[in-house]
Design a protein with these regions (language model features):
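Beta-strand-rich domains and repeat architectures in extracellular enzymes and scaffolds
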Residues: 7-41, 177-179
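Blade-terminus and WD-like Trp-Asp/Gly-His loop motifs, strongest in beta-propeller folds
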Residues: 18-24, 63-70, 109-117, 178-185, ...
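Short loop/turn segments that connect beta-strands within beta-propeller blades
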Residues: 47-49, 90-94, 160-164, 206-209
Length: 248
């Protein structure tokens, strides 16, 4: 048996973020980019039991299947500083078409809130400072998969394709951890925090105004989804437990 070498890991393909809609199957193929200490991502489509590359830029990790003919994704192909573009790409071939540009980096499209309004999400820095060092004064200040989180918050936006208006749903120190669109409304978990992040997050609903759906109280909502018209939560009380241990 051969031992596993670094080159084996660098050539390994990480598949994820599979989405299926209207018979369309799209997923992300990630490969390590050693020189950049990062990953290169490619959107791939499964059609007639064959896999096709949709993108080749190496930066597209998030996307939304618009219909059986096209997908939406965000990127910065023109390398404009502090900017994100929204692209539409036909599944039957052709170049991605830019349909919007935002003066915010790292935007990711979640889907349609209604027929002319999209929901987007991005990680934003609370205070813009030009400095050659970083002051960590929040807990947590770093998280695996996210990088530095100190003085950064995940924010939600809506974008009207007709009026070109970008509206911030959550702002300031509010931090979004999970978001889904269901039945014409935006549901998300998160909390407003400074200095130290709490364990418990509420579930909110946005349909033009914000309302609280579930008050977490003593339970931390890890994830949520909708099944057969019902809201399903995975939550934790953060009580200590061990193998075969009953907390009662």
């Amino acid at each position: 048996m051969k031992s596993v070498e670094i080159n084996d890991l660098l050539s390994y393909h990480f598949y994820g973020n599979l989405k299926v809609k209207d018979g369309v199957k799209v997923f992300v193929d990630g490969v390590a980019a050693e020189k950049d200490n990062a990953y290169e991502y490619t959107l791939k489509c499964v059609k007639d039991d064959k896999v096709y590359d949709l993108t080749s830029f190496g930066k597209e990790a998030g996307f939304y299947i618009e219909n059986e003919n096209s997908v939406l994704f965000c990127g910065n192909r023109k390398n404009i500083e502090k900017s994100t573009s929204l692209y539409r790409l036909a599944l039957n071939g052709g170049e991605a078409k830019e349909i919007a540009r935002f003066d915010k980096p790292g935007m990711n499209v979640l889907g349609y809130l209604n027929e002319n309004t999209l929901v987007l999400m991005t990680k934003e820095k609370l205070v813009e400072e030009e400095s050659d060092y970083e002051v960590f004064d929040e807990i947590p200040f770093y998280m695996n998969g996210q990088g530095i989180t100190n003085k950064h918050r995940m924010h939600l936006y809506t974008y009207n394709l007709d009026t070109k208006e970008l509206v911030c749903v959550t702002e300031g120190t509010f931090d979004v951890s999970n978001a889904k669109i269901h039945d014409g409304a935006l549901y998300y978990t998160g909390q407003n925090w400074t200095r130290k992040q709490a364990l418990y997050e509420n579930l909110y609903k946005y349909d033009g105004s914000v309302s609280t759906v579930v008050d977490a109280k003593e339970r931390s909502i890890q994830s949520f989804d909708f099944m057969d018209g019902k809201l399903v939560l995975i939550a934790s009380t953060h009580e200590k437990y061990g193998l075969n241990e009953n907390p009662k």
